[in-house]
């Protein structure tokens, strides 16, 4: 995230983030990941000189259910459209590109959203956006997990 940012003379910065990774025992409940982060660069008087946010979330089902996947993306689009109607298209593409595995010629999982170096909103609104990304992730993921957590499975599915 720092590669396109110019260096400040004092080199002070702060990076804060929260990551959540879920690897459930039941293979009918997908693995998922969520991350939100804020970076700040400071001038010699310790004032914020520059800042940006990043984050996202993605879903990697062991046993894909098309209705879960469609709803996952539908909820992400609905949420992001309330901020900016270009966000879903851009952030979904970023997720697909970020989680592409070249030697397999495939993506990891079924997608989600990913963004970095974002600074479209004020810092206050950006922090609110990050909070809402985390809440949206929890709502979307828990909806799937709650629906699938009691689905029976054989021990052979654990060793996929």
Residue ranges of model-derived segments:
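Long, contiguous internal "core" modules enriched in hydrophobic/ aromatic residues
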Residues: 44-155
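Conserved small/polar residues in nucleotide/adenosyl-binding loops
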Residues: 159-160
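Internal mixed beta-strand/loop scaffold within catalytic domains of large alpha/beta enzymes
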Residues: 1-53
């Amino acid at each position: 995230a720092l590669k396109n940012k110019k260096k400040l003379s004092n080199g002070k910065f702060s990076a804060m983030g929260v990551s959540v990774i879920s690897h459930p025992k039941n293979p009918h409940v997908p693995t998922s990941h969520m991350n939100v982060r804020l970076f700040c660069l400071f001038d010699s008087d310790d004032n914020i000189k520059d800042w940006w946010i990043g984050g996202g979330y993605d879903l990697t089902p062991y046993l894909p259910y098309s209705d879960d996947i469609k709803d996952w993306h539908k909820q992400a689009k609905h949420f992001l459209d309330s901020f900016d109607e270009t966000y879903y298209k851009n952030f979904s593409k970023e997720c697909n590109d970020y989680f592409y595995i070249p030697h397999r010629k495939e993506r990891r999982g079924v997608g989600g959203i990913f963004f970095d170096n974002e600074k479209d909103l004020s810092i206050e609104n950006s922090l609110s956006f990050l909070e809402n990304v985390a809440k949206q992730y929890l709502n979307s993921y828990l909806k799937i997990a709650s629906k699938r957590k009691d689905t029976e499975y054989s021990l052979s599915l654990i060793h996929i």
